[in-house]
């Protein structure tokens, strides 16, 4: 009788534990970092020391963390630092990319081969814009730059 109850509890709690771990805090070399998801990968971002409480809605979703131009990210202790450039890469032709840029308050930089570069103004939350674009069915990536970054 205990085995089915335990299995049922584990099944019910598994999704919740994943959400609770999604925004965790990590300490390395005496510095505090929090996790952030960018382009489907988890990175570490320096925690500025603020002890903000995370408000959860009734569906238990954690609000998305903001990401701005100049933010520095790391994948781990030994990984190089990556800097958020403020540019979004979107899969769109020239006309569509220009329309997206206008609609979302971005600057159209250039387009080639169906990929356009859209630049955000300083202080813009890139995660919020990327989420909006994805909800519109647009393939989007937030550009990260680093001295040792190489394509996979």
From Swiss-Prot:
Keyword terms: Chaperone, Periplasm, Secreted, Signal
Signal peptide (residue range): 1-22
Record carries keyword Secreted: yes
GO cellular component, one term: extracellular region
Primary location: periplasm
Regulation: Degraded by ASP after secretion and dissociation of the ASP-ORF2 complex.
Localization per record: Periplasm; Secreted
Notes on the domains: Contains an N-terminal extension, a central body region and a C-terminal tail. The C-terminal tail, which inhibits the protease active site, and the N-terminal extension are both critical for binding and folding of ASP.
Biological role stated in the UniProt entry: Required for the production of the active form of the Aeromonas extracellular serine protease (ASP). Acts as a chaperone that helps ASP form an active structure in the periplasm. Formation of a complex with ASP in the periplasm also inactivates the protease activity and likely protects ASP from intrinsic proteases. Dissociation of the ASP-ORF2 complex after secretion in the extracellular space generates an active ASP.
Quaternary structure annotation from Swiss-Prot or TrEMBL: Forms a complex with the serine protease ASP in the periplasm. After translocation of the ASP-ORF2 complex from the periplasm to the extracellular space, the complex is dissociated in a pH-dependent manner.
Listed name of the protein: ASP external chaperone
């Amino acid at each position: 009788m205990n085995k089915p109850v335990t299995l049922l509890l584990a099944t019910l709690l598994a999704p919740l534990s994943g959400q609770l771990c999604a925004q965790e805090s990590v300490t390395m070399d005496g510095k505090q970092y929090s996790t952030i998801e960018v382009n489907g990968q988890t990175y570490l971002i320096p925690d500025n020391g603020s002890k903000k409480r995370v408000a959860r809605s009734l569906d238990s979703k954690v609000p998305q963390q903001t990401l701005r131009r100049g933010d520095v990210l790391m994948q781990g202790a030994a990984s190089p630092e990556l800097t958020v450039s403020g540019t979004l890469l979107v899969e769109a032709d020239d006309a569509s990319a220009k329309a997206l840029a206008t609609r979302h308050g971005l600057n159209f930089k250039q387009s080639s081969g169906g990929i356009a570069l859209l630049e955000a103004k300083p202080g813009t939350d890139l995660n919020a814009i990327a989420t909006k674009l994805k909800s519109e069915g647009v393939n989007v990536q937030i550009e990260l730059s680093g001295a040792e970054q190489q394509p996979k």
